[in-house]
């Protein structure tokens, strides 16, 4: 019986990881509207509120989904996430994570600690 439980647990972990892992190349295409505020590999953003480059994709997914479900509200973000699927969010989060460091380090720009704090709410 314990073997069956161990196999079931391993299968659940593997399937969850496969679903949660996004594709950065697809995320780059789907997240083009995110670049104006959050930047990209070669662009810091017009008014970079939160630079997402190199951020933990799980934290980004959690926070983005809170905007999608209405648990968090922002005039810009709440509109930006309309129509995104779970897969879209995973892909966009993977894209920003794959960038590494932000194009332009800006003092005072919020980062992972803000994302983690808001995601925990």
Which functions belong to the PLM regions below?
Residues 52-53, 63-79:
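Amphipathic, hydrophobic secondary-structure cores in small proteins
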Residues 24-35, 44, 53-62:
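Sequence context surrounding c-type heme c attachment/ligation sites in exported
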Residues 21-31, 40, 72-75, 79-121:
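Flexible coil segments in periplasmic/lumen-exposed cytochrome c-class electron-transfer proteins
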Residues 15-17:
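N-terminal signal peptide c-region/cleavage motif recognized by signal peptidases
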Residues 36-39, 69:
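Regular, well-ordered alpha-helical segments
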């Amino acid at each position: 019986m314990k073997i069956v439980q161990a196999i079931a647990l391993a299968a659940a972990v593997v399937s969850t990881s496969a679903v949660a892992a996004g594709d950065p190349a697809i995320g780059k295409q789907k997240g083009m509207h995110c670049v104006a505020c959050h930047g990209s590999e070669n662009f810091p953003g017009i008014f970079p509120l939160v630079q997402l480059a190199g951020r933990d994709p799980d934290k980004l997914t959690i926070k983005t989904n809170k905007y999608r479900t209405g648990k968090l509200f922002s005039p810009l973000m709440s509109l930006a996430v309309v129509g995104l699927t779970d897969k879209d969010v995973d892909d966009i989060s993977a894209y920003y994570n794959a960038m590494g460091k932000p194009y332009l380090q800006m003092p005072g720009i919020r980062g992972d600690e803000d994302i983690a704090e808001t995601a925990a709410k």
